[in-house]
Amino acid sequence: MKQRYTHYIIGMLTALLLVACDAHRDFPDTAMKPCHILCTDGKVLSYEDYEKSGKQAIAVVFHINQREDVEGNGYAVYLWDIEPKAFADSIGIAQGTSADLTAYDGNINTFAMYGTTDTFSPLAESVFDIWRYGQSAYIPSVAQMRLLYAAKAVVSPIIEKCGGDPLPDETNDCWYWTSTEVKGQQTAKAWLYSLGSGAMQETPKIQAHRARPI
């Protein structure tokens, strides 16, 4: 009886040691982080893993969402600019986008621009044209452009490594459309955002400017 009890104790100690060893095992960190690469097949990889993978990059992660009230797990910026396009082809129509400067609603805004039948949005059309391999894209809101501006210093070199257009610093080459209309002037103006300085500028919607989809 005593011998059987001793064997039982030894067995229990061995099991506890095995559990303890398992608890300290190192696992690879697969969490999505800023500067990770979004590939055309939907995979998100670190830059080091992307280089080995042979996959095609389409965007670079620049922000991870921590808030439950914000849609999606995070944001990735498209590698290339959209050539200058007008927000709308005519003045006088509110296109149904938000005028809230704090809302992370670029996806909803872009769909509203695209779906407005009383006026045509060359900008929204050009963004919808770049959808491929199931990867959606949209024009960021003012709030989302602020997040991109805050991450520019770390994200832009990775964009360039992937063969994309680096986020600009030049004063005269840094203005991009947002999908946010100007409050009280929704029928005529929307906001431009400077990725050079973080400044904003209300602008007639019929003017052609670049966009950087996310």
Stretches with model-predicted labels:
Residues 1-19:
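Sec-dependent bacterial lipoprotein signal peptides
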Residues 3, 56-59, 171-178:
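Short small/polar-residue motifs
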Residues 21-133, 205-214:
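Short, compositionally biased
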Residues 71, 180-214:
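Solvent-exposed, polar surface segments
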Residues 120-137, 142-195:
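An exposed tryptophan-centered "aromatic clamp" motif
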